Amino acid sequence: MRNTLFGILFLFILPLQAHQKLPYLQKQGSTTQLMVDGKPFLVIGGELGNSSASSIEDIERIFPKLQRMGLNTVLVPAYWDLTEPQEGKFDFTLTDKVIQQARANDLKVVFLWFGAWKNSMSCYAPIWFKEDYKKYPRAYTKAGKPLEIASSFSENVFQADSRAFSQWMKHIASVDKEEGTVIMIQIENEIGMLEDARDYSKEADKLFYAPVPSLFIGYLQKNKRSLHPEMLAKWESQGFKKKGTWQEVFGADVYTDEIFMAWSYAQYVERMAKLARSIYNIPLYVNAAMNSRGRKPGEYPSAGPLAHLIDVWHYAAPNIDFLAPDLYDKGFVDWVAKYKLHNNPLFIPEIRLE
């Protein structure tokens, strides 16, 4: 009987231990800590260049250098075009090599999914995706020009991106669940619209001139006192309307276009995040190119996870753990203050070394 009881307890304890090994975020007073192997983990990290993990040779050459630099974490791109070079056929060779080299050099890994968007553009999407622009439509400018930016309003775009992402996440879970080398995932990279503040495709226009979702209006009403000042001012400018189109609720300008586009991007990312959590529940984040140097939406990547759009992103993408700023401009202290919030832990993936 005692042996039987021990066996039953052992069966229950094993899944619990495996679960406890997964990284997670934990609130400690006013601070949020990244927990790895059940202990607070301070990331001393560096991010590889855009194509620095695109060959086995480069990975093997770079990773030992990172250890010698004193890093404990490396942020590494994972490329959709190299993961799914042929539609439906997946190659995880580079992912496996990253994990193997990280373990060999005592490093943790934060993977960056270069999927439908990288720095706004769809440059790391597979060639079969790029060539079939009818099935996988592009975003359009106001003047009617198609961009090399996949449309976030296309279900086909989402299905293709999310299928590859899901297969990749399943692979990571299968090869790394016991070791716990991979500690976070960034979904897409510096998502945002360029040239114009929003997509002007027919699908986008249809939703832009439709009513603002009532649930989002309800969120604004419930959180009126804590809204970002810019979001509050936009809503107030139209008399705090409780229903109407995007322009009727927020006004007819480029910043309303940006709010609308942020809603679309955040919903897309939320669907990706839900898939990720259902497969391998580790911390997830998105990064943002800054709205700096007096530029307007579209001059900077419009509608990304920016501080003034935090209400849109937090509501529409609740499965994202934090919005992360990429800091290449002067005014470090001011930028950090925009993102170091009670509801947004500060993590800076990219920064210019002055």
Model-based region annotation:
Residues 18-72:
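N-terminal carbohydrate-binding accessory modules
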Residues 38, 74, 102, 168, ...:
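Conserved, mostly hydrophobic/aromatic
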Residues 45-54, 77-95, 142-163, 171, ...:
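The substrate-binding groove and active-site-proximal loops of carbohydrate-active enzymes
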Residues 58-133, 262-279:
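Aromatic-lined substrate-binding rim segments of carbohydrate-active enzymes
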